[in-house]
Amino acid sequence: MSETSPKLRAELDGVPAYVPGKPAAAGGPVAYKLSSNENPYPPLPGVLESALAAAGSFNRYPDMACTGLMNELADRFGVPLGHLATGTGSVGVAQQLLQATSGPGDEVIYAWRSFEAYPIITQVSGATSVKVPLTDGEVHDLDAMAEAITDRTRLIFVCNPNNPTGTVVRRAELERFLDRVPSDVLVVLDEAYKEFIRDAEVPDGIEIYRDRPNVAVLRTFSKAYGLAGLRVGFAVAHEPVAAALRKTAVPFGVSQLAQDAAVASLRAEDELLGRVGSLVAERTRVSAELTRQGWTVPESHANFVWLRLGERTLDFAGACERAGVVVRPFQGEGVRVSIGEGEGNDLFLKAAEAFRAEL
């Protein structure tokens, strides 16, 4: 037998592994998982019923065109059907965008730290990441990002709100930035946490896209809508980009169960708003208490908060786990803490206060 192995793409060498939020230990002392920005509420009304109905046809392929969901989204956001594309969560659509735009020799710009998947999917595409550090206030440095554009730049991610810091880019600064971006460079507004924003100065990306052919918007059903386990997201973009997304989509990638659940979730708007409102109130409470304890907490516009801890990051995460909550550490940088059930949030706050008392 030959000792050589199949030849693989060199671009995959050194691709960083995506690190998911650590789960709560089964049967152990840890009771609350605040590590993955999941919605703590059960599925919205009508979702389980739609899922059960879809379960009866698991022997059939799903609607590859996602017709029902696409029509619902077109009506909801007032966009043409040809400007929509679906995928396996917003990260799946982001990967499709890179497949459509970027390859070896191309550059992809994004802030750092930002969404952990960006460097992974960029390297898999063969393109080169250009990471632009956040400002001291943990927000996108849009001036520096604009200055980083070269003739090799093909795509720019703007995560708004930013994961994991929760900070936002407001309308005036975003418009100034977009005016500096060449028309042949695609700007992707990643709005996975859009529903949690309460600042009127933070623009709706779909309104921005309407007049800018080089802007695409990503949304997901994983966060506010509570469908993280079903993997369904979508993009809104002008026809050439949306058409390319449909070409790069995995055939039958979005299950029928996910499609039907997403439609049912869209139709449960009142309940959704109530749940999101409760999570925003908890976010405000948690942020205020952390500030009272003496922590520096960037203003969050998502369903999580960020603490920059540097070398103390893993110690803090360990203290939280011993107290009964799992948070998401980014070694040497800080921790992201999802807003969950009130009891879990209280346990986290107690752990944070105890840790600070020992500093």
UniProtKB/Swiss-Prot annotation:
Pfam families: Aminotran_1_2. GO terms for molecular function: aromatic-amino-acid transaminase activity; histidinol-phosphate transaminase activity; pyridoxal phosphate binding. It comes from the Bacteria. The keyword Hydrolase does not apply. It catalyses: an aromatic L-alpha-amino acid + 2-oxoglutarate = an aromatic oxo-acid + L-glutamate. Aminotransferase that catalyzes the conversion of aromatic amino acids and 2-oxoglutarate into corresponding aromatic oxo acids and L-glutamate. Homodimer. This is Aromatic amino acid aminotransferase. It comes from Streptomyces griseus subsp. griseus (strain JCM 4626 / CBS 651.72 / NBRC 13350 / KCC S-0626 / ISP 5235). The gene is pat.
